[in-house]
Amino acid sequence: FGSALEGLENNEVIYELLADMGWTADSIDLDSWLPVYCKARYGGCPAAMDSAWQRFRETAYSSLYSYPRFTWQTVVPDTRRISKLDVSDSFLQGVELFLSCADSLESSSLFVNDAIEYASYYLAAKADDCYKRALKEDSLGNRVAAMQQLDRSVEILLDVDKLLASHPLYRLEEWVDMARDWGKTDLEKDAYEANAKRLITTWGGFQEDYAARFWSGLIKDYYIPRMKLYFSEQRADLNRWEENWIKAPWHNTSTSFEDPLQSAIKLVERYKEE
């Protein structure tokens, strides 16, 4: 028994479930398994946590799509590799329920990490709604309305970037540092960094934006500038800008919130009606 999933260090619940499946010949009852998982991971499973997971199961974990990405990650809707994210109202309610467990679980670092992640998805979905409206207004020639929606999307995404800066895994800084560590000279380090950044962005040809990494640093310094460029007079220079970004050494400028958990809760409340 084993598993070889594409994309590691994410979605821990799936790895835990697969590992447990290796120890039984019977099917696993998720209604009873998930509360045990939550207690093991966070130290408790309040009623709101159980309700949150019911919503996650009915939405994000009940669907499987190729190329799951937000529209702002591809600049324009991808008509070649059509996909979607199941971030319905039920999913968003699940995030709100998850965050409501903070009072009893805030001492758990794993709860804080997951709260940051879920809140970031919540906010990114709100930003996506704004960005889609910006694209629509732009297509209708409503420049002022388009820029208003673009600015709102960018505002939300900057908060997402700052929130993810506190996550131990979802940071471009970690990726770039690991790549540069392989080089022995500055030239080698720059080459390894460029290759690492290409892998998570343009990739090459048909598979552009394949990775769609949801990372601090990448949102602030790659996705947001790309969005702004698309809505500027330099739209035709998008490919050149991407290549220049890949080849230029990157320096982290993202900062984190002093209290990421409480910031996550406040940001979700702030953008709830977006």
What spans do the regions from the language model cover?
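Substrate-binding groove of N-acetylhexosamine-processing glycoside hydrolases
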Residues: G2-E274
